[in-house]
Each structure stands twice: as C-alpha cells, then as structure tokens.
Amino acid sequence: MECHNQQSSQPPTTTHCSGGETNCYEKRWHDHRGTIIERGCGCPTVKPGVKLNCCTTDKCNN
C-alpha cells in the first residue's frame, strides 16, 4: 500500500506502508492556525471533532 503522508498544504509526498497495512487515512481538524490535515498509513482512532477519512487504494488519501 502506498499512501500520501504530507501535512496540510505541503507538496505531495508518499510512503510505502509496512506490516501489510491496507488502509490510508486523512485527518482534518481546526485550531488557531486554521485547518490542519494529516495523512498517513492505517486508520487511526480520532478524538471528537476530528474528521477522519480512511480508504483502501494506493494514494487514495490526498
């Protein structure tokens, strides 16, 4: 699985996930800096108020 891993509005970068991971994720939340976007491998548990999108194809989380 290959997932995007850049933060917020940085230029796109990708990583090859280890351990047979089959999901990519995108988390979004707001703070004093504005909208923060985090991308990576897996499908993490998030706190209330954080939007989470998990997907199962290469580079699906951009």
Swiss-Prot record:
Cysteines paired by S-S bonds: 3-24, 17-41, 43-54, 55-60
InterPro entries reported in the protein's UniProt record: Snake_3FTx, Snake_toxin-like_sf, Snake_toxin_con_site, Toxin_cobra-type
UniProt keyword Cytoplasm, yes or no: no
UniProt keyword annotations, A-Z: Acetylcholine receptor inhibiting toxin, Disulfide bond, Ion channel impairing toxin, Neurotoxin, Postsynaptic neurotoxin, Secreted, Toxin
Region (Disordered): 1-20
Cited Pfam families: Toxin_cobra-type (PF21947)
PROSITE patterns: SNAKE_TOXIN
Keyword Secreted: yes
Tissue: Expressed by the venom gland.
One cellular component (GO) term of this entry: extracellular region
Subcellular localization: Secreted
Molecular function terms, GO-annotated: acetylcholine receptor inhibitor activity; ion channel regulator activity; toxin activity
Family: Belongs to the three-finger toxin family. Short-chain subfamily. Type I alpha-neurotoxin sub-subfamily.
Chain's role: Binds to muscle nicotinic acetylcholine receptor (nAChR) and inhibit acetylcholine from binding to the receptor, thereby impairing neuromuscular transmission.
The protein, known as: Short neurotoxin 1
Native species: Naja christyi (Christy's water cobra)
